[in-house]
């Protein structure tokens, strides 16, 4: 799709609720958080079609038909995507300027839709070839690979026989096909990797004696195919559709069209190949995609991010090539908004997840997939075999460990860092823990505070006495004050939601999870808003409309945002609304960190006199920290007037 088309379609998708559009064509019923309807794309008798406003997609759990609002209208009315988009604009009274853009879409967009139709038809033939009784040997092969009928149907797996059977089928149907779709013109079949032409001008099948994997885009269009050899080891193991207008490997992730239909999913397993996807899916982890032999690209990451995925779990092959691929991918992802984890293969003798499942079973595979390393743990393990035979080398190794923790670490893994380092260094555990905590707290402060906030520290602390002399009243009575800090930060900027990885969310109470979900839903619904505190009216209207049954939490959240918005003191101190266990003011922590690092080295050299002097300074800074704590707490409590 062209850039202009992508932008217009995305604008339409974000401007409406998919259920509001679909109910103009079929009857929908709300059940829970989703809407349901009788699927119009197959002979449905039950309400099998799920419509999810949060993800802006529909999916039939009977026929697996799925896609976004534009795809629904296009296929329901049997019109092009461009015409479907125009109809939605008019139906929902959207900005008429969108019509002008849509009408400028080139005829090439229409041709792409015809390619989708072409791919869909030939996909059916590949599947029919697989189910042909003459090809029972292929079913036997797949059965030995632990693929059953449900797997074949779910992943739309087919077979391309030998002897140009696809070419013969095309010839026998050519007259009818060419009337329905001019993409069956022979040069189009070559362009889309169904036929090849030899040096004598004769046509042949592109795929021969290969298992066929269907590749979809995120809109559930069949965009290409990949064929795996069965017997002929002299040819490439995989043969893929060549790059076309609709198939670009740097934009497509295998199985992503299925992943985005999973409810409340924030994690994504990333593997290299098709069989690994199927294996992990069968191990009760359906949220898995394959990169199909390429690195994750910026286009991949933009696509993943647009569907609310927050945790990326790398699970590449367990060999030297896979290890290098993991390292390379980590370096690309290190500054991304995602939380990065790596499946810990340990020292098993299996190259990939498919081999592991064949040897140990799917239950054991599921447990292995749960053994994930945070990116910082992975990097620490990588350097663990460093030469430490001399004091100098050991010191360099220690500094490298601290550098990794400071640069890539996370406050939630402090205990793991301590356990790792105490095995090598003779450092008192509590002291080591404090030093690591300071490194990470300071790092997190750097990520959210600007120089102006730091320079205004003295001015802000002058407000402490006035603010803390009030009679404080907790805003969220059942949510502890540390969580209050986190809530305010998330209200200030949506990017901090990305810090809440799955492990953090699992620690929240039921009421805390509700608060986070409410804020998250608002940001998802209002995709252009990044700061709730600047849009309090919209937020209050949203929560009262959608969460009215949670009266207590709604009232308390309403009170919180109103206090922050209308209390002028918050204009000066809102930057200090930091989670106590995650964030603290940078200036003080810089000093404490510096002193403790000095003491760490002094402790190793038994310089007790200087240690005592530094401890006095640390106490002084900690006293100032207490005042800062009062300031933070006061900013989260209601000051009685």
Swiss-Prot record:
It catalyses: ssDNA + n NTP = ssDNA/pppN(pN)n-1 hybrid + (n-1) diphosphate. GO terms for biological process: DNA replication, synthesis of primer. Its cofactor is Zn(2+); Mg(2+). It holds the Pfam family DNAG_N. One of its GO terms (cellular component) is primosome complex. Coiled coil: none annotated. It comes from the Bacteria. The keyword Protein biosynthesis does not apply. Residues 266-348 form the Toprim domain. A zinc finger (CHC2-type) spans 39-63. Mg(2+) 1 binds at residues 272, 317. InterPro entries: DNA_primase_core_N_sf (IPR037068), DNA_primase_DnaG (IPR006295), DNA_primase_Znf_CHC2 (IPR036977), DnaG_bac (IPR030846), DNAG_N (IPR013264), DnaG_primase (IPR050219), TOPRIM_DnaG_bac (IPR034151), TOPRIM_dom (IPR006171). Binds 1 zinc ion per monomer. Belongs to the DnaG primase family. Monomer. Interacts with DnaB. NCBIfam families: dnaG. Contains an N-terminal zinc-binding domain, a central core domain that contains the primase activity, and a C-terminal DnaB-binding domain. PANTHER family: DNA PRIMASE. This is DNA primase. It comes from Ureaplasma parvum serovar 3 (strain ATCC 700970). The gene is dnaG.
């Amino acid at each position: 799709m062209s850039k202009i088309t992508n932008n217009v379609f995305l604008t339409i998708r974000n401007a409406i609720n998919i259920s509001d559009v679909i109910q103009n064509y079929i009857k929908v019923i709300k059940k829970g958080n989703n809407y349901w309807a009788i699927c119009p794309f197959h002979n449905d008798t039950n309400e099998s079609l799920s419509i999810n406003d949060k993800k802006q997609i529909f999916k039939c759990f009977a026929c697996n038909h799925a896609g976004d609002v534009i795809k629904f209208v296009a296929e329901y009315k049997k019109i092009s995507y461009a015409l479907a988009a125009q109809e939605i604009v008019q139906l929902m009274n959207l900005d008429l300027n969108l019509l002008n853009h849509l009408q400028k879409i080139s005829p090439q967009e229409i041709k792409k839709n015809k390619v989708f139709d072409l791919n869909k038809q030939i996909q059916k033939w590949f599947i029919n070839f697989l189910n042909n009784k003459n090809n029972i040997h292929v079913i036997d092969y797949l059965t030995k690979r632990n693929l059953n009928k449900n797997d074949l149907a779910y992943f739309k797996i087919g077979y391309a026989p030998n002897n140009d059977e696809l070419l013969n089928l095309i010839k026998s149907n050519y007259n009818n096909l060419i009337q329905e779709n001019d993409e069956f013109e022979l040069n189009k079949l070559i362009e889309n990797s169904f036929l090849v032409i030899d040096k004598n001008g004769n046509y042949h099948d592109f795929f021969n004696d290969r298992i066929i994997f269907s590749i979809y885009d995120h809109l559930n269009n069949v965009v290409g195919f990949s064929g795996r050899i069965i017997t002929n080891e002299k040819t490439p193991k995989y043969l893929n559709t060549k790059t076309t207008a609709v198939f670009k490997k740097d934009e497509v992730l295998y199985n992503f069209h299925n992943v985005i239909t999973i409810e409340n999913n924030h994690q994504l397993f990333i593997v290299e190949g098709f069989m690994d996807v199927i294996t992990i899916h069968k191990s009760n982890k359906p949220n898995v995609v394959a990169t199909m032999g390429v690195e994750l690209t910026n286009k991949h990451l933009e696509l993943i991010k647009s569907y609310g995925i927050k945790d990326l779990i790398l699970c590449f092959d367990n060999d030297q090539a896979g290890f290098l691929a993991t390292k390379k991918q980590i370096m690309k992802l290190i500054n991304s908004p995602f939380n990065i984890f790596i499946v810990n293969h340990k020292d098993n003798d299996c190259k990939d997840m498919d081999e592991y499942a064949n040897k140990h079973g799917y239950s054991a595979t599921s447990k292995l997939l749960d053994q994930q390393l945070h990116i910082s743990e992975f990097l620490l393990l990588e350097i663990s075999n460093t030469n430490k035979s001399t004091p100098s080398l050991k010191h360099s190794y220690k500094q490298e460990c601290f550098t990794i923790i400071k640069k890539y670490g996370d406050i939630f893994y402090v205990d793991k860092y301590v356990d790792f380092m105490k095995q090598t260094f003779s450092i008192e555990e509590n002291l080591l823990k404090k030093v690591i905590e300071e490194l990470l707290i300071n790092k997190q402060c750097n990520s959210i505070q600007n120089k102006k906030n730091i320079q205004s520290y003295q001015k802000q602390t002058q407000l402490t006495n006035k603010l803390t002399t009030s009679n404080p009243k907790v805003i969220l009575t059942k949510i502890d004050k540390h969580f209050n800090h986190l809530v305010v930060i998330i209200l200030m900027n949506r990017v901090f939601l990305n810090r809440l990885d799955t492990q953090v969310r699992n620690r929240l109470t039921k009421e805390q999870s509700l608060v986070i979900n409410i804020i998250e839903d608002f940001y998802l619904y209002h995709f252009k808003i990044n700061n709730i505190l600047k849009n309090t009216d919209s937020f209050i209207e949203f929560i009262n409309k959608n969460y009215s049954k949670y009266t207590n939490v709604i009232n308390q959240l309403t009170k919180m945002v109103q206090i922050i918005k209308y209390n002028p003191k918050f204009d000066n101190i809102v930057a200090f609304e930091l989670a106590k266990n995650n964030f603290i003011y940078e200036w003080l922590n810089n000093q404490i960190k510096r002193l403790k690092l000095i003491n760490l080295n002094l402790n190793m050299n038994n310089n007790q006199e200087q240690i005592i002097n530094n401890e006095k300074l640390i106490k002084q800074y900690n006293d100032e920290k207490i005042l800062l704590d009062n300031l933070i707490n006061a900013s989260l409590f209601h000051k009685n007037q």
